[in-house]
Amino acid sequence: MTDVEGYQPKSKGKIFPDMGESFFSSDEDSPATDAEIDENYDDNRETSEGRGERDTGAMVTGLKKPRKKTKSSRHTAADSSMNQMDAKDKALLQDTNSDIPADFVPDSVSGMFRSHDFSYLRLRPDHASRPLWISPSDGRIILESFSPLAEQAQDFLVTIAEPISRPSHIHEYKITAYSLYAAVSVGLETDDIISVLDRLSKVPVAESIINFIKGATISYGKVKLVIKHNRYFVETTQADILQMLLNDSVIGPLRIDSDHQVQPPEDVLQQQLQQTAGKPATNVNPNDVEAVFSAVIGGDNEREEEDDDIDAVHSFEIANESVEVVKKRCQEIDYPVLEEYDFRNDHRNPDLDIDLKPSTQIRPYQEKSLSKMFGNGRARSGIIVLPCGAGKTLVGITAACTIKKSVIVLCTSSVSVMQWRQQFLQWCTLQPENCAVFTSDNKEMFQTESGLVVSTYSMVANTRNRSHDSQKVMDFLTGREWGFIILDEVHVVPAAMFRRVVSTIAAHAKLGLTATLVREDDKIGDLNFLIGPKLYEANWMELSQKGHIANVQCAEVWCPMTAEFYQEYLRETARKRMLLYIMNPTKFQACQFLIQYHERRGDKIIVFSDNVYALQEYALKMGKPFIYGSTPQQERMNILQNFQYNDQINTIFLSKVGDTSIDLPEATCLIQISSHYGSRRQEAQRLGRILRAKRRNDEGFNAFFYSLVSKDTQEMYYSTKRQAFLVDQGYAFKVITHLHGMENIPNLAYASPRERRELLQEVLLKNEEAAGIEVGDDADNSVGRGSNGHKRFKSKAVRGEGSLSGLAGGEDMAYMEYSTNKNKELKEHHPLIRKMYYKNLKK
């Protein structure tokens, strides 16, 4: 295997089964969809603003205004990356008035829609056979997924636009500057993009969209970032662009003196004339849509001109620590930096003896994602997004086998490091002595000229004093050129503590892998200049329908708060409220019922809780094993092995340490009793724990995902926000308001008022620290860590709110006084006598 382009594909249900009306019956109407909420909210907003008397959300019957807030967070990486490009996009798209015909007469309702009134757009006579519509104002694309041309159109749109929402029948995309950069990087020409959009659109493509596409693609590829002898150089073939960069107030001062001098413009122009003389232009025939489709689907249209075969004639050097600043500034001035690696012609770095084993098979979607990265003998830096359980690791391994240079892999935890090493040895011919591991427990280096190193973000990003062995390995990593770097769970890279690893390690090609390209801090757009554009994003529903991942039934179970708990909930502080709705007795009973129900079906069940106190209480009450951050490694392995291979252990409780670091393909049911507020990423990562089910290809099989939510609490708002990412991927959450038969199960927990009052008293006695969320032990969670990636140690004294009962020993604490003199006397006695003395003292 020499290139991904040479691959040949090996091969080219019902989501909600009938489980009985008694089980999934609902006493209330289904909740309104996001579209209905937005529509009702917009209809009433103007009226409410005129009166200024009450909240607009209250005018929508049965809806709360916090649901409206989910609209801003429901969109994925596309909207996050667009936030930084708003000014540029608006400048290119603002001139939409030129698209309105002169003879257009607004009707009586045009004023209600204002800028969203597109009644002036004229449908084409054959619009029924065309699958998409493009908004002239913001570049949003609506695709009919039931159209005969939908499959080809999806492959095209994923290349040129960002997927926003992809439910069953209607998909939404958005054209952004970054998505167009990615399209040009895989070989598409500007005219080809406009031509195909025009042929697929129900209405003529607006002039504003055409100008936006031309403006975003005209400057791509004119500035390159290359690595020579472990030094970074900015290169360009045009003298005016070089002069502009050097005169820039940000980039100019970052230039450092080197022996690479800029050639005179006359020489540059003469070389350009010699290079381009006699070369025919190669454009895809606009009349041949199939040719353009094949060019997009294939990933590269094999351009005849080899304009990159010779070295750039203009260059200047920048320092390693300035790489991020320069790349970001180039994005801002509309000259995005191109990072391509001509690995076939790189004879300076030694080759790595690595190939896929003959038994290794690449799935079609994995091959398609790799074709976006490789083309024309070059490797492009960028990001590939695949759902959990879809084989992201194998994609990275295949890319490493294609480049055949030294590889470094960065993961989020030491557990992931060992998994990556094991996967490399399983799927390819790499020898164990060429595969090194760099963690807190293992500090290895390969002894040959080239090899593989697997490490964590925390180990590389650490800025504290290192041990001798650790510093020796770090010098080894930073003192050489790497052909390829794989960034697992790449969504953690924008964090302040980890983004420095991108420039610390000098790598020619970068590949970011993730299932959830979302962050709650809107820093996901930084990946466009830290790593590169998004090269490919798979459709979760499509992979599920083809059997590559499991079909999942998602449900939100509403658990009413008992009267005693809700009364205390209304009067307590925010942190104590969290503990009350997590320890809701009705939620406990629902969890117990679902565990018993699915154990009878033969399912393997995982129960997730971010709150350690609740995790222990639930698990001990039900007699189930549990794992959290303080669980010893050996005990973890024993519990996981029994869960996988012991028929008597069918349920385990996990804290957030199981979100990403634990691979349990046997799990078929997941129950979530507490979570990390409104984190969309965590919701998708937890769903991924059951997407790897081994029986996913069995007819009629489904995996089950339950989110238990205490009704009429803040948890309902967080739950709606968390589901936004999965809803955009096409998943539907069924609302269950009552579990029939729950009251009749034997040994129902907290069935009597007395038991519920005792539980409430125990919860109220707990201090607010018990309501906290466990800090993860991996790089995927930056909470509780310092700027260098190390865990923050608790201080001896913590300032916080308290009560007089706590000072008086009323929080389940006892006061004990010891006599120092008596203790000294007891030291001279036999240990048995000392034990009897202390025993009597406690009585």
Curated annotation (Swiss-Prot):
Residue stretches of biased makeup (Acidic residues): 26-41
Q: Where is this motif: Nuclear localization signal?
A: 64-75
Q: Which residues form the Helicase C-terminal domain?
A: 589-743
The pH dependence is: Optimum pH is 7.25 for helicase and ATPase activities.
What are the BP-aspect GO terms? nucleotide-excision repair; poly(A)+ mRNA export from nucleus; regulation of mitotic recombination; RNA polymerase II promoter clearance; transcription by RNA polymerase II; transcription initiation at RNA polymerase II promoter; transcription open complex formation at RNA polymerase II promoter; transcriptional start site selection at RNA polymerase II promoter
Top-rank taxon of the source lineage equals Eukaryota
Spell out the Pfam families in the cross-references.
ERCC3_RAD25_C, Helicase_C_3, ResIII
Q: What molecular function does GO assign, one term?
A: DNA helicase activity
* SUPFAM superfamilies per record: P-loop containing nucleoside triphosphate hydrolases (SSF52540)
Identify residues that carry Phosphoserine: S752
What's the name of the protein? General transcription and DNA repair factor IIH helicase/translocase subunit XPB/SSL2
Identify the gene encoding this protein. SSL2
